[in-house]
């Protein structure tokens, strides 16, 4: 099996399509920052946007969305990669020394819904790409990915219409350096339950370490 992580270059899409015609052993995903940002609308060499592979141009972004809307991606990942502000070189502006990664796990669903709704993405399809499909890929479909009797009680209460602007004091992960600051997003996570334990209440983290190591069985 071959899995392609974090596809950002649309040039790879046709090759992947052609290969998928002859095998079911090839899977591919992409990440929110490649679908939300584009090179024309971010500052040149700004360390806060540094990631690998890099964020690309608008036309590339459009082609990634076309592929997603036509059921090309097997699922979506977060590629959450936080770092202390000093490692992102926010003060020095040194792009080459900066940590290559974007922190955004908390905003994965709102970011994708904000960008996706404008393009006609159905919320049910988006949720499947973030839950059911990755669970199946990981061999966890017997306990994860659906609201079903006997499954783990992993539940997210999501207000798809509520808008909010990302500010530092609403960020729940330790390191606050993220390019999503000052972005206005549509759709807000209100409550989250992990294994039946409420870990987010009224959009605030209230419980740590409720998760468990997940192993394919």
Where are these regions (language model features)?
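Predominant activation on well-ordered alpha-helical scaffold segments within soluble catalytic domains
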Residues: 13-17, 36, 65, 69, ...
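Short Gly/Pro-enriched turn/cap motifs at secondary-structure boundaries
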Residues: 54-55, 147, 180-184
């Amino acid at each position: 099996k071959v899995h392609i992580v974090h596809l950002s270059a649309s040039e790879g899409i046709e090759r992947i399509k052609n290969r998928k015609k002859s095998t079911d052993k090839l899977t591919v995903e992409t990440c929110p920052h490649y679908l939300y940002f584009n090179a024309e609308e971010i500052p040149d060499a700004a360390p806060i946007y540094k990631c690998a592979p890099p964020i690309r141009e608008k036309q590339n972004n459009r082609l990634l969305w076309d592929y997603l809307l036509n059921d090309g991606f097997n699922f979506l990942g977060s590629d959450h990669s936080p770092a202390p502000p000093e490692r992102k070189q926010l003060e020095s502006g040194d792009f080459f020394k900066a940590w290559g990664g974007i922190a955004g796990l908390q905003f994965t669903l709102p970011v994708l819904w904000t960008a996706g709704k404008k393009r006609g993405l159905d919320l049910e399809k988006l949720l499947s790409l973030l839950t059911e499909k990755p669970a199946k890929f990981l061999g966890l479909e017997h306990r994860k990915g659906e609201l079903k009797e006997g499954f783990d009680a992993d539940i997210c209460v999501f207000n798809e219409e509520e808008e909010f602007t990302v500010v530092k004091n609403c960020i729940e992960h330790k390191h606050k350096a993220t390019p999503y600051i000052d972005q206005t997003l549509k759709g807000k996570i209100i409550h989250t339950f992990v294994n039946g334990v409420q870990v987010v209440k009224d959009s605030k983290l209230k419980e740590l370490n409720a998760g468990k190591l997940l192993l394919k069985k």
